[in-house]
C-alpha cells in the first residue's frame, strides 16, 4: 500500500486556507472518495507526489502539457523570458510569433486576441457574438463546459429546447433566460430552438468534442448541421476548442472534422502549462473588438511574455507527424483498456478523439450527457483508487478524459494497461 501521510496533512491545512482546500473543485477528489494527491514535481510522462510516490500521468494539468512535464525547450524559454522581465503592460514581439502560428494552423482564425484563461476566451467570444449580431440569446449544449461565466453556468429547463435555469447560486435568472440549452449531438433540437427563438439567437457555442462529460465525439453530420443551421439563421458558430485545440489534430478539432466555425476559443495547449486563453475568427468579426471596434475586452496580463513564450515553444514542437504518433499510442491504450474490461466482464464504453480517451463504466453508448450519467460512479471511484495504488494518475472524475503526451512511451502505455488489468480483476466481483 502506498503512503499518503504528507498529502493528507497538507490537505487538512489547506481546508482552513482555501474553499474546500483547493483552487478548483475537481482537485478535491471528492467524487473518487479519497484525499487529493499533493504533487511536488513532474518530468516527462511522470509526476511525483509529496510522499515520494511516482505516477504515470494522464491528467497533464488537465490537458495543456502536450509535451509532458518540464519540457526542456519550454523551460529554457521561460528562464530566458523571466530574466528579461515577466510582463511590461506593452506589446512584445513574442505575441506576434505565437499569433502567427495560431493563425497559420487554425482554419477559422484570421485575427486572434490573447487572454488569460479559457473562461475569458468564451466570455469574450459571447460578448463579441452578441455585439456583432445585435442579438441576445446563446445556444449551448447540456453537459458541455465552457468555463464559469454566468451565461454558461446554465442547466436545462423542461422540454426539448428551453430557456435555461441557473446552475449555480449567484447566476441571475435574467442571465439564464438568455441561454438556450439542448442535448449534445441532437441536431433536431437545435433546429427546433431556432424555430422558436431564431431571430434572437446570436450564436451556438459547442465543443467539437465534448470533454467535460467524459470524452464524447460528435455524431456524423452533427457539426456540419450546426454550421448549416447557423448560416441559415444569421447566427455565429463558436467552437470552444480550449480542450481540443492542438490536442486532437494539428489543425485542431475543426481541421479534424472539416467544419469551420466563425469564432474559435483556445486555451490549455497554447500556453504550454501557463495561464492563457485566446479567441479569434474572421477578420470582419474580430475587427469589432476594441480598440479597432466598439466591443470592449481587456486584460492586465493578456499576452504576457511568459505565457506567449511557453505557448510558442509548445506549438513549434508539434508537427503533423506528432499526431500520427498520437493516434498510434492512443489506439494502443484504447485497445488495451477495452481488452481488460472485456476479459473481466465489466460493462464499459470507450470513446476517443485523437489523444483524448474516455472510459465509461456502462453498457450504453455514450453520445450525450444523459448517456454519460448512466455510468457506474461507484465502480469508477473504486477503479480510480486502485489505479492510484498501481501508480497511474488519472483525472479524478468519471466525467473527465485521459490525455496523452508526446513523451508517453510504449512502456508507459503497457504499464497502464497492466495496471488496469489488475484493478479490474480485483473489482469484477
Curated annotation (Swiss-Prot):
<dbReference type="GO" id="GO:0006782">
    <property type="term" value="P:protoporphyrinogen IX biosynthetic process"/>
</dbReference>
<dbReference type="InterPro" id="IPR005814">
    <property type="entry name" value="Aminotrans_3"/>
</dbReference>
<keyword id="KW-0413">Isomerase</keyword>
<comment type="pathway">
    <text>Porphyrin-containing compound metabolism; protoporphyrin-IX biosynthesis; 5-aminolevulinate from L-glutamyl-tRNA(Glu): step 2/2.</text>
</comment>
<dbReference type="InterPro" id="IPR004639">
    <property type="entry name" value="4pyrrol_synth_GluAld_NH2Trfase"/>
</dbReference>
<protein>
    <recommendedName>
        <fullName>Glutamate-1-semialdehyde 2,1-aminomutase 2</fullName>
        <ecNumber>5.4.3.8</ecNumber>
    </recommendedName>
</protein>
<dbReference type="GO" id="GO:0042286">
    <property type="term" value="F:glutamate-1-semialdehyde 2,1-aminomutase activity"/>
</dbReference>
<dbReference type="GO" id="GO:0030170">
    <property type="term" value="F:pyridoxal phosphate binding"/>
</dbReference>
<feature type="modified residue" description="N6-(pyridoxal phosphate)lysine">
    <location>
        <position position="268"/>
    </location>
</feature>
<dbReference type="InterPro" id="IPR015422">
    <property type="entry name" value="PyrdxlP-dep_Trfase_small"/>
</dbReference>
<comment type="subunit">
    <text>Homodimer.</text>
</comment>
<dbReference type="InterPro" id="IPR049704">
    <property type="entry name" value="Aminotrans_3_PPA_site"/>
</dbReference>
<dbReference type="GO" id="GO:0005737">
    <property type="term" value="C:cytoplasm"/>
</dbReference>
<dbReference type="InterPro" id="IPR015424">
    <property type="entry name" value="PyrdxlP-dep_Trfase"/>
</dbReference>
<comment type="similarity">
    <text>Belongs to the class-III pyridoxal-phosphate-dependent aminotransferase family. HemL subfamily.</text>
</comment>
<keyword id="KW-0663">Pyridoxal phosphate</keyword>
<keyword id="KW-0963">Cytoplasm</keyword>
<dbReference type="InterPro" id="IPR015421">
    <property type="entry name" value="PyrdxlP-dep_Trfase_major"/>
</dbReference>
<dbReference type="Pfam" id="PF00202">
    <property type="entry name" value="Aminotran_3"/>
</dbReference>
<dbReference type="GO" id="GO:0008483">
    <property type="term" value="F:transaminase activity"/>
</dbReference>
<keyword id="KW-0627">Porphyrin biosynthesis</keyword>
Amino acid at each position: 500500500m502506498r503512503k499518503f501521510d504528507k498529502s493528507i496533512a497538507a490537505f487538512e491545512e489547506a481546508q482552513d486556507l482555501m474553499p474546500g482546500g483547493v483552487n478548483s473543485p475537481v482537485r478535491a477528489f471528492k467524487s473518487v472518495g479519497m484525499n487529493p494527491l499533493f504533487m511536488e514535481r513532474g518530468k516527462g510522462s511522470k509526476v511525483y507526489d509529496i510522499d515520494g510516490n511516482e505516477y504515470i500521468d494522464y491528467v497533464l494539468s488537465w490537458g495543456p502539457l502536450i509535451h509532458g512535464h518540464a519540457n526542456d525547450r519550454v523551460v529554457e524559454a521561460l528562464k530566458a523570458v523571466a530574466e528579461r522581465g515577466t510582463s511590461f503592460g506593452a506589446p512584445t514581439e513574442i505575441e506576434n510569433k505565437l499569433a502567427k502560428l495560431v493563425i497559420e494552423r487554425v482554419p477559422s482564425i484570421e485575427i486572434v486576441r490573447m487572454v488569460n484563461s479559457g473562461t475569458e476566451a468564451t466570455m469574450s467570444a459571447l460578448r463579441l457574438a452578441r455585439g456583432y449580431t445585435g442579438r441576445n440569446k446563446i445556444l449551448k449544449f447540456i453537459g458541455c463546459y465552457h468555463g464559469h461565466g454566468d451565461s454558461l453556468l446554465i442547466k436545462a429547463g423542461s422540454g426539448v429546447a428551453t430557456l435555461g435555469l441557473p446552475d449555480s447560486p449567484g447566476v441571475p435568472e435574467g442571465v439564464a433566460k438568455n441561454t438556450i440549452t439542448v442535448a449534445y449531438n441532437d441536431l433536431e433540437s437545435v433546429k427546433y430552438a431556432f424555430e422558436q427563438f431564431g431571430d434572437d439567437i446570436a450564436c451556438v457555442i459547442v465543443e467539437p468534442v465534448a470533454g467535460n462529460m467524459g470524452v464524447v465525439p460528435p455524431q456524423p453530420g452533427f457539426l456540419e448541421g450546426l454550421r448549416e443551421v447557423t448560416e441559415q439563421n444569421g447566427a455565429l458558430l463558436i467552437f470552444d476548442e480550449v480542450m481540443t485545440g492542438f490536442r486532437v489534430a494539428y489543425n485542431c478539432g475543426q481541421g479534424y472534422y472539416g467544419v469551420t466555425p466563425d469564432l474559435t476559443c483556445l486555451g490549455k495547449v497554447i500556453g504550454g502549462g501557463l495561464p492563457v486563453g485566446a479567441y479569434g475568427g474572421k477578420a470582419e468579426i474580430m475587427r469589432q473588438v476594441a480598440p479597432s471596434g466598439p466591443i470592449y475586452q481587456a486584460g492586465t496580463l493578456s499576452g504576457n511574455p511568459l505565457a506567449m513564450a511557453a505557448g510558442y515553444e509548445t506549438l513549434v514542437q508539434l508537427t503533423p507527424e506528432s499526431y500520427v504518433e498520437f493516434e498510434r499510442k492512443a489506439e494502443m491504450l484504447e485497445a488495451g483498456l477495452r481488452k481488460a474490461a472485456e476479459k473481466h466482464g465489466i460493462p464499459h464504453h470507450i470513446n476517443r478523439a485523437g489523444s483524448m480517451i474516455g472510459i465509461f463504466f456502462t453498457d450504453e453508448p455514450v453520445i450525450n450527457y444523459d448517456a454519460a450519467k448512466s455510468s457506474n460512479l461507484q465502480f469508477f471511484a473504486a477503479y480510480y483508487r486502485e489505479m492510484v495504488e498501481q501508480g497511474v494518475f488519472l483525472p479524478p472524475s468519471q466525467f473527465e478524459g485521459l490525455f496523452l503526451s508526446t513523451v508517453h512511451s510504449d512502456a508507459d502505455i503497457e504499464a497502464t494497461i497492466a495496471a488496469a488489468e489488475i484493478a479490474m480483476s480485483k473489482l469484477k466481483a
